[in-house]
Amino acid sequence: MPLSEPVPRQLRHRRAIRAEAYERGDGLWDIEACLTDHKPRDVALASGIRPQGLPIHELWLRVTIDRELNVVDAEASSEWVPYPGQCQSAPPAYRALIGLNLFRHFRRDANRLLAGVAGCSHLTELCAVLPTAAIQAFAGDVWNVREEGGEGPDHDGVHAEPPFQLGRCRALRFDGEVVRQYYPRWYGASRPDLPGEGSTKE
């Protein structure tokens, strides 16, 4: 259902975050995230006036992953920044993401490696969207999310486990209507120790 009707108001700032996933010709996947900040007016920054229409920030983060969600390459780019010539020193630090796994405590580890002066606060924010973007990209493509289940980042090839997505949000709880209607085989099941539980929610 939509949000309630707002009181009269005026747009002062727009931040947009988007993520896209690409299957590559070499069998790997690229997960890209972009953050932009705009103001609907000229803005006086410490470095000068930023005219209306030009972004305050336009930041990019790309990780290349295999089908087990291991990060095999990473790069960042600061296209528009409030401190030109200075903010661009941060992107090389994001090579530190190589070797992490998007499903296993990625947000915690990315924050440990890149928080504060180790990186750019906004690029580090973008790290948070990568795990679920990858999971959404893999669902129904790399992983089977239908009733038979048995696939996901920790699957063993035997359909003894429910579909990856079950038990990970309120709508998909095992005793809920969605599972009863669409995944009856798993209705009422319990899975106390979900692989990776919490790792995509940190």
Predicted segments with their positions:
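Short, Gly/Pro- and small/polar-rich lid/capping loops
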Residues: 1-42
